[in-house]
Design a protein with these regions (language model features):
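Flexible "arm" and connector segments at domain edges
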Residues: 1-119
């Protein structure tokens, strides 16, 4: 996306999102690529991988002192939408994802407690 347009729209766009709308649009996007001879979601998953790589690149720049929060924000938004694509394509519900995140966070909390870094 054009950087100037992205920055301009940041000032005028709502900060709340309608998750039903997001999943409806993403589902239509997945279904629109279904008849290209590839498995359902194939093209979308390729794009998700590309977005993950772009975020990785922006994080690398940040670690080298050449970061740009606008670029990071834009790529982070793309990756978050990519996560929703993966959920849609793989049939992973929000409930399942939330449970998995709780398991991971409990593990992290336990490690931090064991190392005296969290009480």
């Amino acid at each position: 996306m054009n950087r100037e347009v992205f920055i301009e729209q940041l000032d005028t766009t709502e900060s709340t999102v309608d998750m039903k709308w997001i999943f409806d649009v993403l589902k239509k996007s997945v279904e629109s690529n279904f008849y290209d001879g590839n498995p359902r979601g194939h093209r979308n998953l390729i794009i998700v991988m590309e977005e993950l790589a772009e975020l990785s690149k922006e994080i690398s720049k940040e670690l080298r002192g050449k970061g740009d929060n606008i670029n990071i924000l834009e790529e982070l938004a793309d990756v978050q939408l990519g996560i929703y694509y993966v959920q849609e394509i793989c049939g992973i519900t929000n409930e399942e994802l939330n449970k998995a995140m709780n398991i991971k966070m409990n593990r992290l909390e336990d490690v931090l407690k064991a190392n005296g870094k969290y009480q």
